[in-house]
Amino acid sequence: MTRRSGPAVARYRVVAAALVASLVVLLAACASIPDSGPVRQGGPIAQVSDQLDLDFNPSPPEKGASPQRIVQGFIDAASSPKNNFQIAREYLTRPMGAAWNPDESVTVDDGRNRTYDHDGNQWSVDVSPVANVDSTGVYHPVLSKAPVGLSYELVRQDGEWRISVAPNGVVVDDPTFRSVYSQQTLYFYSPGFGYLVPDARWFPARVAAAATRVASAVLAGPAKWLNGAVVSAFPQGAQLAVPSVTTNGGVARVDLSSEAAQADQAQLQRMQVQLEQSLASLARSVELSIEGNVQQIPPLNDAAAALQDPPVDSHPIVSRGDSFGLLNGSTVTALSGLSDRVAALQPTAVTVNAARDQAAVLSAAGAFLVRRSGESLRVEARPGIIAPAFDNDGWVWTVPADSPAALQATGATGEPHLVKADWPGATGIVSLAVSRDGTRVVAVLRTASGYSLAVAGVLRGSGGVPTELTAPIELAVGEGEPVSVAWTSGLAVAVLSVTNGDATGISEQTIGGTMTTTTGPALGGVIVGAGGLSHYLVLATDGTLQAPTGTGWQTQADKVGAVAVQLGQP
């Protein structure tokens, strides 16, 4: 058996890095202007990004190429989806070229550690994945460092080596992936149609196919982990009447099958909004038709419109001394009818709903539901509970740190409801947060080997009571010991971790996407989502409230006992 790491791998890695580093180099060396098809009118760049097609132009097989060069060339060529992966298929035998399904998956690897083994005509390639993208476009970070083997078989065809057996899917190094694939945000609804809920997907970044892929994915439904937590406006069975969505002049034309004719006007309006928001990066508007008949759909009125990525106030809500309310400079402005009740509990953790008439509070005496009208209600007295989460339906979520499966939700009646939660491998729970739209939860969990970060959908029963969490997906947790997690937008979460002594780090991750990391403030203890220029604020253990700046962190206030999670604003 022979092991090699061929020169094509290093050469391709350099090209990919150069593409990310310089758009000029990319356009000069690797991009092509379409040389066939009709001339298309470009839309304003600031509004629609689908008018620029960037493609790698990989090389076809060279005459007399060795088996290793054929395998390397095939993997490299599969980075280009142009013309249904035409160049990649040239490396395959004719039967394999017809059978190979590149859309089954994308393995994103680091591009640095590919190794090639062979035993006769059997070849294997070891790659080190950083992520996988499944057939529906859902991005899954790979947390294991173990390499993955891919097997190929080669034969002679017309005197040249060609691949007769290859795994479905493609392998792309990370820098190339970010150039050739683009993140598209699909939207579904919360069960009551009050919120638009994002669902990130990754598709090849080509105009001709992207709009079709997005519309088809919307009709196919949400990512598996969101099933039951969100709903679609489209009638069951509705699909594209023709297998393409055309875009012209910033208008995406979507023709639906006859099943869509079941929809009444309100449903059609929601369908229109769902498609418009899902296609927002590719088109300015959507023309919806059913079996070729264009639908005249009036816009939803403001009262019926769903909220999308609810913002929070740029002023934090804090407990400071005997005061609780909005912080503006050194002044704390009370929340009418709520602040005195919260302050009286001497809170250590608080979440305030969007209307600012209810709050979940943790104090030395347990967890409380505090309301503008009515007495404060103790909803949890079990020892060792972590900071409670809260949702805009008025449910306080509580769980003991050492019993992650003992999650319960309590509403205004004071009756606790067990929320069935399966956290694989969890031995404890550190931090829990409910998304502002109430459809998802994120949790930092302790495991036998360290920590994990998981997100799951929320299933609700009669009256909106949370009953169960969907099977969670695992996210990358970042370096250090995680101590707090927060939603920073409808699609992103941030984790605060202690990295070394008093030092901290923050990892912000798109759910279904990539992660960025930055240095946190010294003594960081709690992170919350924020409005304005900052995605988040951090409360340090010395009582200072810290905000990120371009060069570090700036103290916003001192003597802060708690900074509240905000679920929106009035």
Curated annotation (Swiss-Prot):
InterPro entries: GerMN, Lipoprotein_LpqB
Membrane topology annotation: Lipid-anchor
Lipidation, N-palmitoyl cysteine type: C30
S-diacylglycerol cysteine lipid modification positions: C30
The keyword Disulfide bond belongs to this UniProt entry's keyword annotation: no
Subcellular location: Cell membrane
Pfam families in the cross-refs: Germane
Region forming the signal peptide: 1-29
Gene Ontology, cellular component aspect: plasma membrane
Residue ranges that the Swiss-Prot or TrEMBL entry lists as coiled coil: 257-287
Keyword terms: Cell membrane, Coiled coil, Lipoprotein, Membrane, Palmitate, Signal
Protein family membership: Belongs to the LpqB lipoprotein family.
UniProt name for this protein: Lipoprotein LpqB
Species name: Leifsonia xyli subsp. xyli (strain CTCB07)
Name of encoding gene: lpqB
